[in-house]
A protein has these predicted regions:
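Conserved catalytic core of nucleotide polymerization and phosphodiester-bond processing enzymes
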Residues: 1-203
Length: 203
């Protein structure tokens, strides 16, 4: 399944637009950034695109808001395999255009703004950290399972592993190990390419 195309179909927009919004929202992308990324003429166009997206794909905004609230309340998010990503710095709760301050410790922030006027910093990135952290969990678990079978990757590149294979049967074994490294409610698909060397298949 192509997630970006699925969202594009739901929102009634182009796949490239859906992909930009899907990925950008996880980093807190706003109207100005969306306008620049898609080459739109005005911020109003970007705002209308956001409105169309969120009205037809409401679960994304709900997920973002809920994850942000959880991290604000608890001070951390927990990845798929239980690792905690903490939000230990603080900032003024009220947004003041042109008067941004650097994140501080709780003592510094409460002393400067008052303890009732501060919030945890960077919680808008909570969903991104949850997704990236959980993806890292899955990759690391797959690498451990491969190691148990004496299969050692040459290199890890983000969520990709470069491994020498002996045969198609060997490749299928690697794929099976990686796809079953973490048990999920939805199938975990592993894409596979092979060639005489990395340069032949890496683009």
């Amino acid at each position: 399944m192509d997630f970006h195309q699925t969202v594009a179909d739901m929102a009634g927009i182009e796949r490239s637009q859906a992909k930009t919004i899907n990925l950008g929202l996880f980093y807190g992308m706003g109207k100005a950034k969306l306008q620049a990324e898609l080459g739109l003429n005005t911020k109003e166009e970007a705002e209308k695109l956001f409105e169309k997206y969120h009205s037809r794909v409401p679960f994304v905004k709900d997920l973002m808001n809920n994850t942000s609230k959880d991290s604000q309340r608890n001070g951390y998010i927990t990845t798929l395999l239980g690792r905690r990503c903490r939000f230990d710095t603080w900032e003024e709760a009220a947004y003041r255009p042109g008067k941004l301050t650097s994140p501080m410790t709780w003592d510094e922030a409460s002393s400067k703004f008052g303890e009732n006027n501060i919030r945890r910093a960077f919680t808008y990135k909570a969903l991104n950290k949850l997704i990236q952290g959980s993806a890292a969990d899955m990759t690391k678990k797959a690498m451990l399972d491969l190691y148990e079978e004496k299969i050692i990757p040459h290199i890890q590149i983000h969520d990709e592993l470069d491994i020498s294979i002996e045969s198609k049967k060997h490749a299928n074994k690697i794929i099976d190990i990686m796809q079953n490294a973490v048990s999920l409610h939805v199938p975990n698909k592993v894409d596979y390419e092979s060639g005489e060397n990395w340069g032949d298949i890496y683009d």
